[in-house]
Amino acid sequence: MTNVFKGRHFLAEKDFTRAELEWLIDFSAHLKDLKKRNIPHRYLEGKNIALLFEKTSTRTRAAFTVASIDLGAHPEYLGANDIQLGKKESTEDTAKVLGRMFDGIEFRGFSQKMVEELAEFSGVPVWNGLTDAWHPTQMLADYLTVKENFGKLEGLTLVYCGDGRNNVANSLLVTGAILGVNVHIFSPKELFPEEEVVALAEGFAKESGARVLITDNADEAVKGADVLYTDVWVSMGEEDKFAERVALLKPYQVNMELVKKAENENLIFLHCLPAFHDTNTVYGKDVAEKFGVEEMEVTDEVFRSKYARHFDQAENRMHTIKAVMAATLGDPFVPRV
């Protein structure tokens, strides 16, 4: 059976065409519908999936696990203490071993080079569950959520608020540009995206007709926005920068004042989670005590408002990850896109 995705890796959004990403988003919606109606879709019957987690996760682990089981596969979780990537065994050797035992490999960790080496040497499809550079599975969930709310993607405006050089900002910028979505990064100059990432996005935007804007001006960034999106102020491994980030990013918090600047009652709010919108966590209490900040990247008011779609977005991680796994490892009929 013909399948143009068969055997391919999912490492970064830039490796896929607009038509391919749109197909994966639509296939995700189809699989979501099948699950809601309890219709089996076991594209990976009898397959074994390795889930490599150098970085911990709630949503990514849960999504890959449930998606694997729904597809008829067996997922095996290997955490940071279970794998020796680059420590006692090279990534190349680990990849060659796992590729002989598993049919597909998910990796969530720090280095993009590491996930690329797994892909190069394993001989099986490898899926990027997050690296410091890119977060491609998150993007499919994000843009599926946007499409569910607006019925389209092209011509919409998504504004990312906060740390403009993290993996989520990179991926939103490039994926949006590919899909014809206008992406604005609203960030302090010190945290603007890398020039290389902006140049890549601008190249795709030229083809799709999208607009790329990098600014520290709230009015310029947010007016006319369809989507406001934010992420944590400090990424994993950067905890020592907390005081600096709180001071730098407080003006970029998503609050009702910022929402009103968009002048769009149909606006939606997205967050890839976890979110620090109150003090109901150990982390939140600690930050409140040390820095006097009870709400960080988003206020509790916005987080619980009619605009919020982040729990739909979190659920969509499972459906979109399922689509990627089924398309690259299974046998759906996809002669062309």
From Swiss-Prot:
Gene3D superfamilies: Aspartate/ornithine carbamoyltransferase. The keyword Cell division does not apply. Pathway: Amino-acid degradation; L-arginine degradation via ADI pathway; carbamoyl phosphate from L-arginine: step 2/2. One of its GO terms (molecular function) is amino acid binding. L-ornithine binds at N167, D231, S235, M236. Keywords: Arginine metabolism, Cytoplasm, Transferase. It comes from the Bacteria. Carbamoyl phosphate binds at S57, T58, R59, T60, Q84, R108, H135, P136, T137, Q138, C272, L273, R317. One of its GO terms (cellular component) is cytoplasm. GO terms for biological process: arginine biosynthetic process via ornithine; arginine catabolic process to ornithine; citrulline biosynthetic process. It is found in: Cytoplasm. It catalyses: carbamoyl phosphate + L-ornithine = L-citrulline + phosphate + H(+). HAMAP family: OTCase (MF_01109). Reversibly catalyzes the transfer of the carbamoyl group from carbamoyl phosphate (CP) to the N(epsilon) atom of ornithine (ORN) to produce L-citrulline. This is Ornithine carbamoyltransferase. The lineage of its organism: Bacteria, Bacillati, Bacillota, Bacilli, Lactobacillales.
